[in-house]
């Protein structure tokens, strides 16, 4: 399965991320595109929110795969859209369990 196949499912309002999580875990390019959808902040809600749903599951199962995106994800916490701010907080929470670089200290100081 590739990103285009996943993206075809984004148009539904009852999106289930589960069928796509393993692909995102296994395929770095798919995962990167999904993260880009989330952090870009310009996409239609179905695209960024459904991408977020997949990425959240990836972060829950294997947070190491998303940890390198910490700064890009956290940058959303100042976004004008409250969904983006909420996504930033939610994903960072998933990454705290492996915060070996102690990146959360900078957030606590904010």
What kind of region is each of these model predictions?
Residues 56, 93-94:
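Structural signature of alpha-helical solenoid repeat scaffolds
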Residues 42-44, 80-82:
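Short inter-helical turns and helix N-cap capping residues of alpha-solenoid HEAT/ARM repeat scaffolds
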Residues 2, 17-24:
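Basic/polar, acidic-poor N-terminal "presequence/leader" segments
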Residues 16-17, 48, 85:
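Residue-level detector of extended alpha-helical repeat arrays and alpha-solenoid scaffolds
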Residues 2-4, 27-39, 63-76, 98-110:
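Amphipathic alpha-helical scaffolding segments comprising HEAT/armadillo-like alpha-solenoid repeats
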Residues 1-12:
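Charged, compositionally biased N-terminal leader segments and the immediate start
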Residues 20-23, 57, 98:
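Surface-exposed cleft-lining segments at the edges of enzyme active sites
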